[in-house]
Swiss-Prot record:
Originating species: Synechocystis sp. (strain ATCC 27184 / PCC 6803 / Kazusa)
Protein name, as recorded: Orotate phosphoribosyltransferase
Matching PROSITE patterns: PUR_PYR_PR_TRANSFER
Function (record text): Catalyzes the transfer of a ribosyl phosphate group from 5-phosphoribose 1-diphosphate to orotate, leading to the formation of orotidine monophosphate (OMP).
Pathway: Pyrimidine metabolism; UMP biosynthesis via de novo pathway; UMP from orotate: step 1/2
Keyword DNA repair: no
């Protein structure tokens, strides 16, 4: 099912929510053309996840799906600004409705130049707190790895990275080489298949 109202999206079975989100990504976020990725690599397609993650219905679907993917005892989700900001917020908000509260943390690329000069925005958590890093799109894996390193340097335990989309260009293998578990809701092939059926 690719057409759900917001009311239905709140309670629809997760398999339907997953198909709905896949349709949103293929319809609104996926573009073909000539692009340069943040990794510096050229590409014939681009996924602008924010065109879905910043929609109310996209955020709700993402929050519901990713919350169910979190390992046990996870107390927080985090991600590198800007792409992960709406994702961690969506998961945290849905977690409150599900009565399984998860804190959202936002990781800066550069330390704030004023005030606390912090790399990590959000509530301060106890050392050893289990945190999962969330990402919109993974290519090489280097962007989310910066978030992992910042969190570990702050004393948090990070073992898992979860992405909405895996471009299948080495990110999974990179995370495995770093001792991290990696999951993605969709592969680029999933999105391209739906895109080409439009």
């Amino acid at each position: 099912m690719t057409d759900l109202t917001l009311a239905a999206l709140k309670t629809a079975p997760l398999a339907q929510v997953r198909q709905y989100l896949l349709h949103l990504l293929a319809t609104h976020a996926y573009k073909e053309g000539d692009f340069i990725l943040s990794s510096g690599q050229p590409s014939t397609y681009y996924i602008n996840g924010k065109l879905v993650t910043l929609r109310a219905e996209g955020a709700l679907a993402i929050g519901r799906l990713l919350l169910t993917e979190l390992p046990d005892q996870v107390e927080a989700v985090a991600g590198l600004t800007l792409g992960a900001d709406p994702i961690v917020s969506a998961v945290s908000t849905v977690s409150a409705y599900e009565e399984k509260p998860v804190v959202a943390l936002i990781i800066r690329k550069e330390a704030k130049g004023h005030g606390t000069k912090a790399y990590i925005e959000g509530p301060e958590l106890a050392p050893g707190t289990k945190v999962v890093v969330l990402e919109d799109v993974v290519t090489t894996g280097k962007s989310a790895m910066l978030a992992v390193e910042r969190l570990r340097n702050a004393g948090y335990q990070v073992d898992t990275v979860i992405s909405l989309v895996d471009r299948q260009q080495g990110g999974r293998e990179f995370y495995q080489s770093q001792g991290l578990t990696f999951q993605a809701l969709f592969t680029i092939g999933d999105i391209q298949q739906v895109y080409r059926q439009k």
